[in-house]
Amino acid sequence: MGYHSIIYIFLFLPVCLFVYQLAPEKWRGRVLLGFSWIFFYLLSGKLLVYLLGTTLLTHCIGIWLTVIRMQEAKAVEGLERKQKKAVKMEYQKKGRRVLALGIFILLGILGYLKYFDFFTVNLSHLFGHPVLEGWRPENLLMPIGISFYTLQAIGYMTDVYWGTIQAETEIWRTALFLGFFPQIMEGPIARYSDVADTLYTGKSLEYRNVVDGYVRIFWGLFKKMVIADRMALMVNQVFDHYADYHGAVILAAAIGYVIQLYMEFSGCMDIIIGSGKLFGICLPENFRQPFCAKNPSEFWRRWHITLGAWFKAYIFYPVSVSGLVKKWNQYGRKHCGKHITRLVTSAIALFPVWVANGVWHGAQWNYIFYGMYYFVLIMLGIAVEPVRDCILETCHINPETRVWRTIQIAKTWVIIVVGELFFRANGLKAGWYMFCNMIKRFDAGQLTDGTLYTLGLERADYLAVIVGCLIVGIVGSMKEHGIHVQKKMEELAVPVRWGLYYALIIGILIFAAYGDGYQIQDLIYAGF
């Protein structure tokens, strides 16, 4: 039962809404928790035990850290400044050990389930004989969403340790934060402070929230079923049989995958955020017109925003203020100059971020390469920044002009397409093969000689994708210029507004990729 399924949208959600509204206000959060666990069980069965275990551990660590903080406050009463400092340091060490224990257990479970086979296979190749053979049962499955709720759990415990939030005292509230059903499969990866204000209120359903929620859900379905599922046919054909293709066909498939991935992932986010909106719950946005980005750094501030924000908060910032970086900054300012100091500092802080980004996506070398690809590009951007600024000034080029911005956006599109080619490829070796064949054997004639019609899509399919992309692009452009489309629609006359709503639904029914020749496509990010 995916978010795009008929069962979810027309059965699970309405039943949940009905029971939620009937329940007393103080019990509505527990109703959502019950439906969340039912949803997870329908997806992963007995693997629900992993989510329950993570919830129990996270809650206990949060309480433990709170107890340590209370003990610290009591211990420093009446002490002098030096004594207070010594006592606080001792309790901070206790807190760090407790936090480290929680993180170690969570990452240990995730690593064992998701990465154990990857490490054993590569170690076996390295040493020339089987390593740790039989340590992992063959039928051991990975629960859906574990990569998402593990990060949320680590973020929650860390925020409690930092003192930025208070630990929950009622375990059902911790459980709902980690397991709220709309976000369990694909995120967004919310911080506790992002959702706490609306997650537990239990307020009654409101007409405006229900309408806005379902409109957003159907907008997500449009992107997923009309565009992404259609592009998947061509993309899967080329990437699964990459040795049979070259040149422009590979380029077209890489571009197609960028379209597929964005339309599916952002479409699912629309469904997820819309599902939360039905109950008056505000989940964080995960996309902000990423294809308007002028460089890789900006792209990642607009793409999968909550993942980037998590890495920034819990890896980048802690490394940036670490003792190693502080010592380097002191040394670098004296001996190496401002630019080199900044370059090395950025490298130290960004390297673990991009390693983690690659590894988080999956246990394959092409995902690790994908992370390093963006790390290198971002570091190159920082390295050449003084030279670039000098050239712009010498040539009297205003970087804010539309022409220059268009060039930068086009350059970023090329970077994105190449990166996603390796991301989608069936392994790093396959990615290199496809990339080399795309460059060496490029033939633009393949785009017009009918070759593209042999990849599973007909002319009408490509036309539907193009029109769909134009519609999504226009809406995105309006949002980029500060126009809130849904609010603008609310200003329209009721017949016009509801006419547009029904047009969206009819468009999905007519143009969605289903029926003969089409296969139901699994959610891409649910596999991570």
Name every feature range the model reports, one short phrase each.
Residues 1-527:
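Membrane-embedded transmembrane alpha-helical bundles that form the catalytic cores
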